[in-house]
């Protein structure tokens, strides 16, 4: 999580969010937390992480995975096993973050409001004509739906965890002798020539008698199993199957508009300015100066403790309802344009508020929103009808459990039939974890009964499926005739490999003895240990071979294709420390990850983590 937070703080996306400074800095300084008290999801050393925080983190992670995996993510999330793992990963992430937060507190690490303000004021995102633009920053905050305290906590946490990350980075080091040894081994080069004996070519030259095939069959009969197979009837039902049946009348649209006019308005905005003061006495002095005619902007610039808005004469820009604390907005709403309030206490500061201008709510005309309302009503009616029909189909599947014909008739769709298949080769239409579980883990495959309604869609595209096993073929041992062709290939492969290995071993013996032998080696090539993943079988042999002295060393092995290979090791060149720099940064990052994981493991071992099991169970 620290690495991820560290990456986020250096990404463009995070810098945009980071620049959306919390209005709590304007009003009260650093915010106090993401959310208020709520039913807990988990308690970490007595500190509550509520269900709202869990759901927010879950939604954020869903968005990330949806962007990476698309529809496949929602299909995975529909499976109980994956959903359980996903929810646990979200919970673990929140617990880890809280442990790090508490660890930072124990270390007396902290981020001041001035540190965050400095970052924001100097951010290019909110610079206009080379200066910080308060209205631009306020506008971006509103557009992103961020609350003051919520964003303050995010910024504070991000900078705090970055401090810990910096500590981990600075505590991780390696001595030159270690780097020299790693360079020598990881970047070691081995110059080889290879002689390849293709297995496929030799297999084509082999024969296998019926007696040999029968002998293999008798010895390996229990391994020659035909897995259970099914032929499945199924019905798939989606909202689009009944979309053409949904009609929306003009009367419905007009009625909806009248009942929901409040939803079809351009929300009003208020242009505000304020002077923030540390105590009541100072606030009264400034209020009196205003009554005597002193300019509001000048007083804000000279006396306001909110340094950001003070530079703008107290200007907070245009704001919508819900941005400021309730008492602040109530006071502003009671003012006329150009009217100034008496000092009002908001948290630990006093504010004198001025309304510079106001834009009232503007109702959107019916014709402008008509198409939108039609879609809203159509979608609601469609989902309602889809739900009703799905329920009716489920009842019919239960009442007449030996056929799907009437189930399909209710929805106006067809019963489809699969080809014969086993669990390793699921047809695309049935390749869903819920369907596979219903077919293979229960009694359906032998009972011939209809399944329950299976929800195989996702939040954006609902889909219901019913399945029934029409034909069931149990697992059985294949007959000799059925397995004969496969056995023939196996026997021929074994013969070919034995022959090639014997030939290669004989040639290696001759080469080691210095005798002339006809081996067709290819041109020399250089293999580097750090790239062993390219051909692990070959590399394992090459880098385990004895180093050559005055002549090459030889050994028999295989390549990834199964061919038999003679390796001639010509030369070994150790890696140099100066070439190690690119790898060093990767290894350093890995070491830091391991250090962070060890730290979390230690913190968890000493922590009290109380999970709300009832809440977690409800998520399944």
From Swiss-Prot:
| Spans within the Periplasmic topological domain | 37-620
Q: How does it sit in the membrane?
A: Single-pass type II membrane protein
Q: What is its main location?
A: membrane
List the Pfam families hit by this protein, alphabetically.
Rotamase_2, SurA_N_3
| Entry keyword set | Cell inner membrane, Cell membrane, Chaperone, Membrane, Transmembrane, Transmembrane helix
Gene3D superfamilies with a match to the protein in the record: 3.10.50.40, Porin chaperone SurA, peptide-binding domain
| SUPFAM superfamilies tied to this protein | FKBP-like, Triger factor/SurA peptide-binding domain-like
Q: Name one GO molecular function term.
A: peptidyl-prolyl cis-trans isomerase activity
Q: Which residues lie on this side of the membrane: Cytoplasmic?
A: 1-15
Classify the source by domain of life: Bacteria
| Signal sequence interval, chain numbering | none
Q: Which residues form the PpiC domain?
A: 267-357
Q: Where in the cell is it found?
A: Cell inner membrane
Q: Which GO terms describe its cellular component?
A: plasma membrane
What transmembrane ranges does the database entry give?
16-36
Subunit annotation: Interacts with the SecYEG translocon. Binds to the lateral gate of SecY. Forms a complex with YfgM.
Q: What does this protein do?
A: Chaperone that functions as a gatekeeper on the periplasmic side of the SecYEG translocon. Facilitates the translocation of precursor proteins across SecYEG by interacting with the translocating substrate. Also plays a role in the release of newly synthesized secreted proteins at the periplasmic exit site of the Sec translocon.
Instruction: Cite the PANTHER family for this sequence.
Output: PEPTIDYL-PROLYL CIS-TRANS ISOMERASE D (PTHR47529), PERIPLASMIC CHAPERONE PPID (PTHR47529:SF1)
Name listed for the protein in its UniProt record: Periplasmic chaperone PpiD
Organism lineage reads as: Bacteria, Pseudomonadati, Pseudomonadota, Gammaproteobacteria, Pasteurellales
């Amino acid at each position: 999580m620290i690495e991820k937070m560290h990456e986020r703080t250096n990404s463009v996306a995070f810098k945009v969010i980071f620049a959306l400074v919390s209005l709590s800095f304007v009003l009260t300084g650093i915010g106090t937390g993401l959310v208020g008290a709520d039913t807990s999801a988990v308690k970490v050393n007595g500190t509550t992480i509520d269900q709202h925080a869990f759901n927010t983190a879950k939604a954020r992670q869903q968005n990330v995975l949806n962007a990476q995996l698309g529809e496949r993510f929602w299909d995975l999330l529909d499976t109980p096993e994956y959903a359980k793992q996903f929810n646990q990963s979200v919970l673990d992430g929140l617990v880890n973050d809280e442990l790090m937060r508490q660890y930072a507190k124990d270390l007396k690490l902290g981020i001041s409001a001035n540190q965050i303000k400095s970052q924001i004021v100097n951010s290019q995102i909110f610079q206009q004509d080379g200066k910080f633009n308060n209205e631009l920053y306020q506008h971006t905050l509103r557009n992103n739906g961020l609350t003051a305290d919520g964003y303050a906590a995010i910024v504070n946490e991000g900078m705090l965890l970055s401090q810990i990350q910096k500590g981990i980075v600075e505590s991780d080091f390696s001595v030159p002798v270690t780097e020299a040894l790693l360079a020598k081994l990881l970047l070691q080069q081995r110059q080889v020539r290879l002689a390849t004996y293709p297995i496929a070519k030799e297999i084509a030259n082999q024969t296998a008698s019926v007696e040999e095939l029968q002998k293999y069959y008798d010895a390996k009969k229990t391994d020659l199993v035909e897995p259970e197979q099914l032929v499945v009837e199924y019905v798939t039902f989606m909202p689009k199957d009944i979309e053409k049946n949904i009609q929306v009348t003009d009367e419905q649209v007009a009625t909806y508009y009248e009942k929901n006019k409040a939803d079809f308005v351009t929300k009003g905005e208020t242009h505000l300015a304020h002077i923030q003061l540390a105590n009541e006495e100072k606030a009264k002095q400034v209020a009196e100066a205003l009554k005597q005619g002193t300019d509001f902007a000048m007083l804000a610039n000279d006396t306001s403790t909110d340094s950001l808005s003070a530079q703008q004469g107290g200007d907070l820009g245009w704001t919508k309802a819900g941005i400021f604390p309730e008492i602040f907005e109530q006071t502003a709403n009671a003012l006329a344009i150009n009217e100034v309030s008496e000092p009002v206490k908001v948290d630990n500061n006093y504010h004198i508020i001025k309304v510079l201008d106001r834009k009232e709510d503007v109702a959107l005309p019916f014709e402008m929103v008509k198409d939108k309302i039609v879609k809203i009503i159509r979608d609601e009616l469609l989902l309602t009808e889809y739900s009703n029909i799905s329920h009716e189909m489920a009842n019919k599947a239960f009442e007449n459990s030996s056929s799907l014909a009437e189930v399909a008739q209710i929805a106006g769709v067809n019963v489809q039939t699969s080809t014969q298949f086993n669990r390793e080769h699921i047809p695309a239409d049935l390749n869903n974890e819920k369907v596979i579980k219903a077919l293979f883990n229960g009694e359906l495959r032998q009972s011939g009964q209809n399944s329950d309604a299976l929800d195989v869609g996702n939040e954006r595209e609902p889909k219901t499926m019913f399945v029934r096993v029409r034909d069931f073929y149990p697992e059985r041992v294949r007959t000799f005739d059925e397995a004969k062709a496969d056995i023939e290939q196996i026997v021929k492969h074994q013969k070919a490999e034995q022959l090639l290995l014997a030939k290669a071993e004989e040639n290696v013996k001759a080469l080691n003895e210095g005798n002339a032998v006809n081996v067709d080696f290819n041109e020399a090539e250089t293999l580097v240990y750090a790239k062993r993943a390219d051909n692990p079988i070959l590399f394992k042999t090459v880098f385990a071979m004895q180093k050559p002295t005055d002549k090459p060393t030889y050994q028999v092995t295989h390549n990834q294709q199964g061919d038999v290979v003679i390796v001639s090791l010509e030369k070994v060149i150790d890696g140099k420390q100066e070439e190690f720099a690119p790898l060093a940064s990767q290894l350093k990052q890995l070491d830091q990850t391991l250090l962070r994981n060890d730290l979390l493991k230690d913190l968890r071992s000493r922590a009290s983590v109380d999970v709300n099991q009832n809440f977690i169970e409800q998520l399944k």
